[in-house]
Amino acid sequence: MSKRKADLEVSAGGIVFRWVPEAPPRYLLIRDSYDNWGFPKGHLENGESPAEAAIRETAEETGLSRLVLQGPIRVIDWHFRFRGRHIHKYCHFFLFESPEGEPCPQVDEGITACQWRTLDEALDVLSYDNARGVLKRAGEMVRTLVAIGAGRPLRRTD
């Protein structure tokens, strides 16, 4: 008996953060139609790089148009079944900074809400364990931006 191989899918998504005066940065979460909290992501279109797909999907699903790419976070993968198919999905995540504060969920794609949360709040409400690992790494990257002077400090020091 031979095992059927999984169908491969590749997607890309974004972890968006913004600076808040005199407070820790906020991270953007989206809620899907199943009431799961996660991050914007979607399939790569023909000829699109993972970074291009991440910025497109993040902008589409959140309504944020002024996203600044800070760098790749990591690639995660998981297996699932959909309509009788066994799928092995890879998702490339990228870190984005946004100067905009009011996201607008893409309701026609099943996004029911967008919320800015602190790192700890976001870690508490995320619905998927593998998303927590991505967010923790994003938080480390933001702390590094602050440490090297490429980002705004979390608190004023003067």
Task: Show where each model-derived region lies.
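Acidic, metal-coordinating catalytic segment for phosphate/diphosphate chemistry
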Residues: 1-22
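Conserved beta-strand and immediately adjacent loop positions that scaffold enzyme active sites
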Residues: 13, 26, 113
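Short, solvent-exposed loop/turn segments that connect beta-strands within catalytic domains
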Residues: 20-26, 83-86
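Short, acidic/hydrophobic/Gly-rich beta-strand patch recurrent on exposed beta strands
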Residues: 28-31
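Unchanged
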Residues: 43-133
